[in-house]
Structure formats: C-alpha cells, structure tokens
Swiss-Prot record:
HAMAP family: HutU (MF_00577). GO terms for biological process: L-histidine catabolic process to glutamate and formamide; L-histidine catabolic process to glutamate and formate. Its cofactor is NAD(+). Pathway: Amino-acid degradation; L-histidine degradation into L-glutamate; N-formimidoyl-L-glutamate from L-histidine: step 2/3. This is Urocanate hydratase. The keyword Cytoplasm applies. It comes from Thermoanaerobacter pseudethanolicus (strain ATCC 33223 / 39E) (Clostridium thermohydrosulfuricum). Its main location: cytoplasm.
Amino acid sequence: MSRVIRAPRGTTLHCKNWQIEAPYRTLMNNLDPEVAEDPANLIVYGGAGKAARNWEAFDKIIESLENLEEDETLLIQSGKPVGIFKTHTMAPRVLISNAMLVPAWANWENFWDLEAKGLTMYGQMTAGSWIYIGTQGIIEGTFETFAALAKKHFDGTLKGKFVLTAGLGGMSGAQPLAVTMLDGACLVVEVDRNRIQRRLDTKYLDVMTDNLDEALEMVLKAKEEGKPLSVGLVGNAADVHPELVRRGIIPDVVTDQTSAHDPLNGYVPNGMTLEEAFALRKSNPEEYIKRAKKAMAEHVSAMLEMQKRGAIAFDYGNNIRRMAYDEGVKEAFNIQGYVPEYIRDLFSEGKGPFRWIALSGDPEDIYKTDEKVLELFPEDKLLERWIRLAREKIKFQGLPARICWLGYGQRAEFGLAINEMVRKGELKAPIVIGRDHHDTGSVASPYRETEAMKDGSDAIADWPILNALLNTASGATWVSVHHGGGVGIGYSIHAGVVVCADGTKESDLRIERVLTSDPGSGVMRHADAGYEIAIRTAKEKGIKMPMLK
C-alpha cells in the first residue's frame, strides 16, 4: 500500500521554528494526493517532476528538518539531503540544486542514465523546490496569457471564440478554466481519462467526452451562443488535430501544453492505447521516444496548417516546436512563443507570479489575505477581477493557497503587510510566500521565458544564477537552482525562492530584502537587454545599474 503524505495543519511546531517548519510542511504538501499527480512515485507534476529522489531521501529530509538548528542550513542535491552546515539565523534554512549537469552532458539521454544510477532527479520547477500548490499555481499565469491574447486580437474577451489545446496535467489543467474565465469555448484533448476526471473534480473543466463529434457539437454551439464552456476530449492530439484539419474545422486559437518537453515520461504517442504506451515505455524506451517524437511532428504540423488557415497559434512553453523541428517540421518555429507575444512587457516591469500558502491549513487565512491585497492595490482592476474569479471558481488543493501577479514594489509591500497580519494575530499561523521559477529574472530558457530577447541574450544563463545568489544573500528561507524545467533537460536553467512570514521583526527584514531584490533582478535583466519598459522602471524605482544610460 502506497504512503499517503499530508502536511500538518495548525500551530504545533514539528521543527525548531517556523523558518524550518515552512519547508517541512510545503515539501509534504507537494506530495499531498490532492496536489501531486503521482504521489506514490514522488512525482508532483510536469511529466516526471519530483519532490525527492526516493522515499529514503524523503524520510531523511524530513528527519533533517525536524532536527535542524535555527542557525544551520540543509543542502539538497537533486532530491537528496547531503549536508547540514552551521551558517547564521538570517541565512536560508535550505539550499537546493536539482538536475544540474555540465553543459556538454546536458541532454535527456545522459540525464536518464545518471538518474537510473540514482545520481540525480528531475525537479521540474516547483516540484523539487517544494512550493507547488496544485493547478492554481499556473492558473493566473494562464489567465494573464489568454487575457493578453484577447486584448491583442479580440477586443479583450474570448467570448464567441473557440480555443483548441491539449494536455490536462498539473499545469496544463489550468487552460480550460482560464479560457472560460474570459468567456471562451475551449476543447482540450487529453489521453488520460483520469486526468480529465481530476480537472472535473476540481472544477477546472466543465464536461468530459470520448466522442469527437459530441465534443465539437458542444464547443461550436457554445462559441455560436457566446457562452463559456470547456470540454475535455479523451484522445490524442496527434490524431484529433489532423482530423479537425481534414474536416475543415479551424479554431480561433490553437496552443498546446502536453508534456512534450519529456519524450519518454511525458508525451504519449498516438496509434496505441494508454496502457500499451506505458508498457512500451518500460519494455523499449528507444522505440517509445521515436514514436512520441513522430506524433509530436504530426501534432505540430496540424497546428501549422490551422495557423495557415487563420488560427492564432502560439507555443505554450513545452518545447514541442523543437521536438517537431528535429523530426523534420522545418516551419515549426513559425508558431510564436507565448512570452515574447504576450508576457514580456509584464516581465519587463518586474511583474510575475507571486504565491502564498496558509501554513495553518485554514482557508480563512487566505480569504483575509485576499482582502488585504485588494485593499493595497485598488487601482489594479485585472487583479481585482482575478481575485474575485479565483475565490468563486478555484478549489484549494492541499494547504490553502493563492496566486496573483504582482510587480516590483507591490511584492514587498504585500509581503510586509502579511507579516504584520501574522504578528497581530489576524492570521492563525505564518504564511509562506514564494513564486514559480517562471518569473521575470529567474530563468534562462531560449524556447520559453527568454525566447527572442531584444539583444540576443536568449541562452545567457548568468541571470538565474545571479538571482539565486542575490536571494540567498538577501535572507530567503530557502532558495533553489534547477535545470530543465518546462522545456526539458538541456534547454533551461532557473531559480526559485521562498520566504516565510512568521510575524517576527527578522522576517520583516527578510521579506523586504527578498521581495525587492527578486523582482528587481528581473527588471535589471530586461533593462540590460534594452527593453524600454524595464529601463524606465529601473530609473523610476531607483534600481542601481552601473551601466544603465
């Protein structure tokens, strides 16, 4: 019988203080059955993104945190605790490095070989950095992306528009809800019936069907009537998308969030059942990868044909274009990436995904912080709309949590306000504040966050390392550096940061420094690349950049 892990609730400490209790609880929360995609195998989301290397390592991490002193730092090497060193009370309590490889060795084949030897672990982004909050963790970013698309192409709404996509995993499962929040009609293709059911259970999806004709009838009727609706179709996009092209049914928007970044443990080939695919994955991995890449080529070819016939097509950061390109689809990069198309301006002003978790386990703590963020930033109408929709439509998974996009200055102001609420006893327990690695200054990913940079610096990976070093120096509660998140091994380097608001004056210092430095490094990165919004933000906010003219 598999183990069931859930984070403790309430105010009883299992560690020496809340700065240690915070990672203790959020690591467990990552493996909560409500949160993780495959908790029995320590897989949190994103194909094979894990929280710990194996169960022995997990147990040792928990034991280490329970015994960690207030002035010690625990080191995690790809999901395994390898050392505890005396540092100081304002240093991070945990430092994490996941899946890092010397560049010439940085490909899936070498990674899988080293993983099989028990030497490394794929941490995705927030899986191995212990700050995943379920599908809500990506929902506002997805909402922001589709809102920006709607603003650019459709007068600010998806009403009366048909959006086609694929994938209903831990991250991709946010797509249907984001589309219906913007009043659109969405068809999502997913090979795994259980994943579709999970999105139904959490109310991210409206309807499930096995029948393409039925799915199209529902979606096209909703489009015609201008009603929001999301339909999950059990099927393979490499079969469904070409069939839509053959029928001449072209969506208004087409994208994709399957786990194409991982051709072995993520994307599922067409022409076989899910059970047959899983069996082939184990018996003949090389053949599986070959078939998966062939299916990706068919999938992307159909998206390109839809684009030629008038659909707005964009890549949603899973590296499917590169996989298809390597299989001979030379026009794959005619599909534009979502960051340069819709998100870059937000990143340039230091805006990105800001999340917080109620360690008490009480939803009321989140509702009170919802009110606080609205009180602090009444001029931000998109934020107001988002919080209202989130409270209405999003079901908490594991420990109650919230995400919203906040910019430079806003993050520190809100973080300090949360710490004050904890100090005054307005909240039942401390709050953990973190973010996705998919943020303004914390990623080098040429096929996603840093695609088509103005100065050609797409592949420069100094920036996420500087971000991690700066957050460590600023006194974050824990800091992580990962390789391969989102787009796969060899294609990205990225960093994460978390700070615990425990109500102390020391936390005021941590929060102000971290939540200023972290987004500030993103403004710096984009200003250095020549983005006018970032240059203006740096000057207006007084961010010191010695070479900024």
